[in-house]
């Protein structure tokens, strides 16, 4: 988060190397560090731009990837792209200079604001994905058919608005303090460092963990219930001499032993001579004047023009049967939802692990600097945890796309086209 630019009581360039040691920037040690920062920065910027650009292009060109859930991935990729374009070049420049800020203070303030907003947006997008997956598991059918696009747009809009709100104080003159050193680019207000750290990490991180835990538990309960239903389906089927048949609109009556000329009695007709369960076949039934395609009207339907007691047979069948989704369609829909969420469940440990690995050290170090001015934090540690936080922007495309078979196929097509 932009908190990499956190205030440093010991004169450290928050997340950008030792500001107090700018005078020694020409030394051999700092020159070597500057060269390493330049090479590492170029590689990191290239990885972030390539990975996240490929994500955006894949979703824009591949219709199969244009799903509501992937809109969060595009928003996350956009935040990381802006970070690589607007923040990382200036960060690398400062690292190459040994931590000294040789540009204007206004540009420093703009860098701080962009850093805070874009890094906060990146983490908030991760939280939005966790919210979306939790909803997909909690109410899967409703998730697919009710207000999906609107929900995603609201979450993405809230992500960017909240990120801008966290960064707004920097643009409103928070860094304009007396005695400000123009050679140091950092956040000057320790209270703001605590505020931005809490809003950007210490609140959304537990929320994301809680939602992922609830998602994982919900998927486990879903899987247990599905297996129990599959195993318990056979005993509930009716037993009989013949194989079970799919449920028809009307119950099937057993065949009469009288022979092929015997049919089950129609309602209201006398029993046939063959037996109590048999009536003469269709020829003994009175012919309807409207023809063979006429059937008695169903309750609640208007009479057919050909007669007061006649209605089209299709209308009768439609009225007699309650509206139902075919069992095959329901099974396919459940299988599709279950398969998608199984993939999400397999990715969850990778998502949470990478997030915590990249961001926890950074926020622990920088909030410690803000809350404990007397604590001495090595400049190299500050720089290392800052780099680690930025690396998360390069890992996001790997986590959210390489583990997805559809994205993998699109990436292969793109690489083959380029090669």
UniProtKB/Swiss-Prot annotation:
SMART domains (UniProt xref): 7TM_GPCR_Srsx
Transmembrane segments: 30-50, 72-92, 111-131, 153-173, 193-213, 347-367, 383-403
GO biological process: adenylate cyclase-inhibiting dopamine receptor signaling pathway; adenylate cyclase-modulating G protein-coupled receptor signaling pathway; adult locomotory behavior; arachidonate secretion; behavioral fear response; behavioral response to cocaine; behavioral response to ethanol; chemical synaptic transmission
Membrane topology listed for this record: Multi-pass membrane protein
InterPro entries: Dopamine_D4_rcpt, Dopamine_rcpt, GPCR_Rhodpsn, GPCR_Rhodpsn_7TM
Effect of residue 382 to Y: Increased basal level of G protein-mediated signaling
Glycan attachment points: 3
SUPFAM superfamilies: Family A G protein-coupled receptor-like (SSF81321)
Cytoplasmic membrane side: 51-71, 132-152, 214-346, 404-419
Region (Disordered) residue spans: 230-264, 317-336
Record's GO cellular component terms: centrosome; dendrite; glutamatergic synapse; membrane; plasma membrane; postsynapse
Residues annotated for (2R,3R)-nemonapride binding in this entry: 115, 196
Lipidation (S-palmitoyl cysteine): 419
Positions of Na(+) binding: 80, 122
UniProt keyword list: Biological rhythms, Cell membrane, Disulfide bond, G-protein coupled receptor, Glycoprotein, Lipoprotein, Membrane, Metal-binding, Palmitate, Receptor, Repeat, Sodium, Transducer, Transmembrane, Transmembrane helix, Ubl conjugation
Distribution of this protein across tissues and organs: Highly expressed in retina. Detected at much lower levels in brain, in amygdala, thalamus, hypothalamus, cerebellum and pituitary.
Biased composition (Pro residues): 238-254
Sequence ranges of the Sequence repeats: 249-264, 265-280, 281-296, 297-312
Sequence ranges on the Extracellular membrane side: 1-29, 93-110, 174-192, 368-382
SS bonds (residue pairs): 108-185, 372-375
Main localization (coarse): membrane
Subcellular localization(s) per the UniProt record: Cell membrane
Region feature 4 X 16 AA approximate tandem repeats of [PA]-A-P-G-L-P-[PQR]-[DG]-P-C-G-P-D-C-A-P, mapped onto this chain: 249-312
SUBUNIT field: Forms homo- and heterooligomers with DRD2. D4.7 allele exhibits higher affinity for homodimers compared to DRD2 heterodimers, while alleles D42. and 4.4 have similar affinities for both. The interaction with DRD2 may modulate agonist-induced downstream signaling. Interacts with CLIC6. Interacts with GPRASP1. May interact with ADORA2A. Interacts with KLHL12.
Family: Belongs to the G-protein coupled receptor 1 family.
Protein name stated in the entry: D(4) dopamine receptor
Taxonomic source organism: Homo sapiens
Organismal lineage: Eukaryota, Metazoa, Chordata, Craniata, Vertebrata
Gene it is expressed from: DRD4
């Amino acid at each position: 988060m932009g908190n990499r630019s956190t205030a440093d009581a010991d004169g450290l360039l928050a997340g950008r190397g030792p500001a107090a040691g700018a005078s020694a920037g020409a030394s051999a040690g700092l020159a070597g560090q500057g060269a390493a920062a330049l090479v590492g920065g170029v590689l990191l910027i290239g990885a972030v731009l390539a990975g996240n650009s490929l994500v955006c292009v894949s979703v824009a060109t591949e219709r199969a990837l244009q799903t509501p859930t992937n809109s969060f991935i595009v928003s996350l990729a956009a935040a990381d792209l802006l970070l690589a374009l607007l923040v990382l070049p200036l960060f690398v420049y400062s690292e190459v200079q040994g931590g000294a800020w040789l540009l204007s203070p206004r540009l420093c303030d703009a860098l701080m604001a962009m850093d805070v907003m874009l890094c906060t947006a990146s983490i908030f997008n991760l939280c939005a994905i966790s919210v979306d997956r939790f909803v997909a598991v909690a109410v899967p059918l409703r998730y697919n058919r009710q207000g999906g696009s609107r929900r995603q747009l609201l979450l993405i809009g809230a992500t960017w608005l909240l990120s801008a709100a966290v960064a707004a104080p920097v643009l409103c003159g928070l860094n304009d303090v007396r005695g400000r050193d123009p050679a140091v680019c950092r956040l000057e207000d320790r209270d703001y460092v605590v505020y931005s750290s809490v809003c950007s990490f210490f609140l959304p991180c537990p929320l994301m963990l809680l939602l992922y835990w609830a998602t994982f538990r919900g998927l486990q309960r879903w899987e247990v219930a599905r297996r129990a239903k599959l195993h318990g389906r056979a005993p509930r089927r009716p037993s009989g001499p013949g194989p079970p048949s799919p449920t028809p609109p009307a119950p099937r009556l057993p065949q009469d032993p009288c022979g092929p000329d015997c049919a089950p009695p129609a309602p209201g007709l006398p029993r046939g001579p063959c037996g109590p369960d048999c009536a003469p076949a269709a020829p003994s039934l009175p012919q309807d004047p409207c023809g063979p395609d006429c059937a008695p009207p169903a309750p609640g339907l208007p009479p057919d023009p050909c007669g007061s007691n006649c209605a089209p047979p299709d209308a009768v069948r439609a009225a007699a049967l309650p509206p139902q989704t075919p069992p095959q369609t329901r099974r396919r829909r459940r299988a599709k939802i279950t398969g998608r969420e199984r993939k999400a469940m397999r990715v969850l440990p990778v998502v949470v692990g990478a997030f915590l690995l990249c961001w926890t050290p950074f926020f622990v170090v920088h909030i410690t600097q803000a809350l404990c001015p007397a604590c001495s934090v090595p400049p190299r540690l500050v720089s290392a945890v800052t780099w680690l936080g930025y690396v998360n922007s390069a890992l996001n495309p790997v986590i959210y796309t390489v583990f997805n078979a559809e994205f993998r196929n699109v990436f292969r097509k793109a690489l083959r086209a380029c090669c």
